Amino acid sequence: MRWLAMALVSCLAGCPAFAQSGPSFDCAKASNAVERTICKDPELAKADRDMAATYTALAGKLSGPAKDDVVKDQARWIGDRNRGCGADTDGIAPCLKKRYAARTANLRAFADGPYPFISEQSLARSGKLGKITYSYDIGYPRFDGTTADFTAINARFANAAQKAAADATPKGASGVDREQGWTYEQGFRVYRPSAHAVTVAVDFYGYSGGAHGYGATDCTLVDLRTGKAVGPQDAFVSGDDWLKTMVQLVGADLKKQFVDKPGFDEALEPKNLAKLLREPGHYCWQANRLELILNAYEVGPYVSGPFEVDVPYERLKPLLRADGPVALNP
């Protein structure tokens, strides 16, 4: 890993411009199945080139601890990419496409404001117990900054990842006498709703037997000033006006969506919707809008999948706290 970090630093000092048709590295020196797959796929080559350019632009404007952090994180990401996608049972190319999309988006988010010191950690394993073949590939964030105490939020993400890994590993009572294929994949994206807060959106999908798999998106708003996870009640002004407004906006939008895909009518009842909208995991605060994500079974059947409601910040401006984590510029 040390040699890779040094290579990245050297590249920042004077790498030639990336080839316009190939990836950011020399395909003649491709040393593993992941790199060879990238070299053979023009779409992946472009994804690698774009990601590398985004990384180089970010690292080039950083210095000191921030630059050290992003260089080490990039080296770690490349190593995790090789291990995770190299062992992916669904194929290397699909794994790479997802990883590159998320990494490029996160690097752009890191560049949008003060560097947030967020590194990507991973848990990965594959094996077999009885007749069950299983694998998991889990990415989760760690806040490495020193401006606040991030101990609690880091433990929260790490513990959730460890629990997911344990749940994705078959046990003796898991029906090991039947042929099964268990998988679990998890990644995350970072959004910047303001200069002093980030949203971490964790996406996961798994299958461990049964009629179908399971998946969801869970969002966490982190106030970088305090190092704490905060909920909608911390972003909106005090009182219940924000909740009443959200119930009206979300209820009206869902009613329209239910025309095209089935939903639970009882979910639209104000009391039920209010209870759901108090839960912070649905609130994916982004750069210019709030995205409400309601996962399968929460307001509709599994076949309908998740429901999403976008709310521009202009509609919420009177309700947002001036000193809150999502304060808008005047």
Over which residues does each language-model region extend?
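N-terminal signal peptide c-region/cleavage motif recognized by signal peptidases
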Residues: 14-19
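Generic anion/oxyanion-binding catalytic loop in active/binding sites
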Residues: 28, 40, 66
